[in-house]
Swiss-Prot record:
One GO location term (cellular component): chloroplast membrane
Keyword Oxidoreductase recorded: yes
Pfam families in the cross-refs: p450
Name used for this protein in its record: Cytochrome P450 97B1, chloroplastic
């Protein structure tokens, strides 16, 4: 270790407690698993440690209320959920079964019961749930432009406008061509320096909090690491994408409060059963919707100012020359600067603001979640924690992470991707068919496949894919080493298996190596454009936790 720990974290199976609940007391979580990881530190020899994942739900509904709601839902299902899709299995259940845990947990149970492709009907809505890499590949890569984002676009459009995630296909194609070149190697090399400086500040802040609490003579200290990692991710997005210092690691500004308010509203909309915010007067009558509009106004005002300032100092240049800049020494190495300076791209301010808002929302949650879960998993596996510490000490010594050194930190990188395998962010990818299609039957499904009409909503369950017993050995175990070896189930017809040599030079395992059994950032043309940014950011932050000894 580089420095002696200020406070020791001791976590064992005996004193480790986990509780998983949905993010809302009344609705299932469909897009993400918001979580809160709490450590209790003690400065005495007897240490008490507990981890709590997510907030605790309120009181359970009375059974009679559940029955009334279920009966109404079942009636709507029978009347409005549409015809059967040939021989496709149908999963039907009580809608209130989803209230006490995230939706994707139930989707996993039904996957084991009904197979890799099944129809799920609840109330007036029906979905096709996919838990098979062959079918996922068919939708995401082979027929990528026969599907759009569907329900997801409906939810996110009021927040992200025409940003990359909710954008229609034509807008997406135009913006992807512009944004993708911005994540070039020189930019990522400079970002590693930024990741390091921001992460070091966060870890030092955590240690100072522990040291300060210890001086007060408290027997235990509760520290919300998820909140600290969220602040870290927000600061990195601000500086790396906008060239704007949110100051989120050290203080809380009105912009930060507005950002978190918007994040909470995005989560709320993704989990609420009835889209009441679409009602004409909701934005003025409903208090949380009024607050949401106020938060959007604060963020948009901030982004408009950043765009205006960037355009005032615009230096128009070809893409090739932009990528050749010395980003390590630029005063402004942000992605916004790259987009504004790109020759021949006269995008209007509104579209640019939508792009930035999308990066702010999407780029913030993944990093905070993966770091929190990584700490959780390492706490349960002290042998792997020691192995990671040994690698950091060997590769870095007294030095700091660099782009080149990241290539040597193999085990740390594998910890990040194994965390994303077990706890993907998001656990579901949502698509809607734009025309009729025939889905492959998938493993143990109908060999003739399943015909679906235009307008069919599809849930690709990343959680199910990542924990499928058909494609992973010991799928529920935390084994970063699994990504180093080939894995091929010959019983699965049409799946090429897991082969690290399939994508030579890749720093991190991806959908190509796994033939779509591993999809933490999606796959195909509409795969997340900032995946390498997020993966490197998480890797560097985890390394800094070891370098500055946030735990033993």
């Amino acid at each position: 270790m580089v420095a002696a720990p200020i406070s020791t974290v001791k976590l064992t199976d005996a004193n480790l407690h986990t509780r998983f609940h949905s993010s809302s007391s009344s609705t299932p979580s469909t897009l993400s698993l918001p979580l809160s990881l709490h450590f209790h530190f003690s400065s005495h020899s007897k240490r008490f440690s507990s981890i709590r994942c997510q907030s605790v739900n309120g009181e359970k509904r009375k059974q009679s209320s559940r029955n009334v709601f279920d009966n109404a839902s079942n009636l709507l299902t029978s009347l409005l959920s549409g015809a059967n899709l040939g021989s496709m299995p149908i999963a039907e259940g009580a809608v209130t079964d989803l209230f006490d845990r995230p939706l994707f947990f139930s989707l996993y149970d039904w996957f084991l019961e009904h197979g890799s492709v099944y129809k799920l009907a609840f109330g007036p809505k029906a979905f096709v749930v996919v838990s098979d890499p062959i079918v996922a590949r068919h939708i995401l890569r082979e027929n990528a432009f026969s599907y759009d984002k569907g329900v997801l676009a409906d939810i996110l459009e009021p927040i992200m406008g025409k940003g990359l995630i909710p954008a229609d296909l034509e807008t997406w194609k135009q913006r992807r061509r512009v944004i993708a070149p911005g994540f070039h190697t020189s930019y990522l090399e400079a970002m590693v320096q930024l990741f390091t400086s921001c992460s070091e500040r966060t870890v030092l802040k955590v240690n100072e909090l522990l040291e300060g609490e210890g001086r007060d003579g408290q027997k235990s200290v509760e520290l919300d690491l998820e909140a600290e990692f969220s602040n870290l991710a927000l600061e990195i997005i601000g500086l790396g994408v906008f060239n704007y210092d949110f100051g989120s690691v050290t203080n809380e500004s009105p912009v930060i409060k507005a950002v978190y308010g918007t994040l909470f509203e995005a989560e709320h909309r993704s989990t609420f059963y009835i889209p009441y915010w679409k009602f004409p007067l909701a934005r003025w009558i409903v208090p949380r919707q009024r607050k949401f509009q106020d938060d959007l106004k604060v963020i948009n005002t901030c982004l408009d100012g950043l765009i205006r300032n960037a355009k005032e100092s615009r230096q128009e240049t070809d893409v090739e020359k932009l990528q050749q800049r010395d980003y390590s020494n630029l005063k402004d190495a942000s992605l916004l600067r790259f987009l504004v300076d790109m020759r021949g791209v006269d995008v209007d301010d509104r579209q640019l603001r939508d792009d930035l808002m999308t990066m702010l929302i999407a780029g913030h949650e993944t990093t905070a979640a993966v770091l929190t879960w990584a700490v959780f998993l390492l706490a349960q596996n002290p042998d792997k924690m020691k192995k990671a510490q040994a690698e950091v000490d060997l590769v870095l010594g007294m030095g700091k992470p660099t782009f080149e050194l990241l290539k040597k930190l193999e085990y740390i990188r594998l910890i990040v991707v194994e965390t994303l395998r077990l706890y993907p962010q998001p656990p579901l990818l949502i698509r809607r068919s734009l025309k009729p299609d025939v889905l492959p039957g998938g493993h143990k499904g109908d060999k003739d496949g399943y015909t679906i009409p235009a307008g069919t909503d599809v849930f690709i369950s990343v959680y199910n894919l990542h924990r499928s017993p058909y494609f992973w050995d010991r799928p529920n175990d935390f084994e970063p080493e699994r990504f180093l070896v080939q894995n091929n189930n010959e019983e699965v017809e049409g799946w090429a298996g897991f082969d690290p040599s399939r994508s030579p030079g890749a720093l991190y395992p991806n959908e190509i190596i796994s033939d779509f059994a591993f999809l933490p950032f999606g796959g195909g043309p509409r795969k997340c454009v900032g995946d390498q940014f997020a993966l490197m950011e998480s890797t560097v932050a985890l390394v800094c936790c070891y370098r500055i000894s946030m735990w033993n």
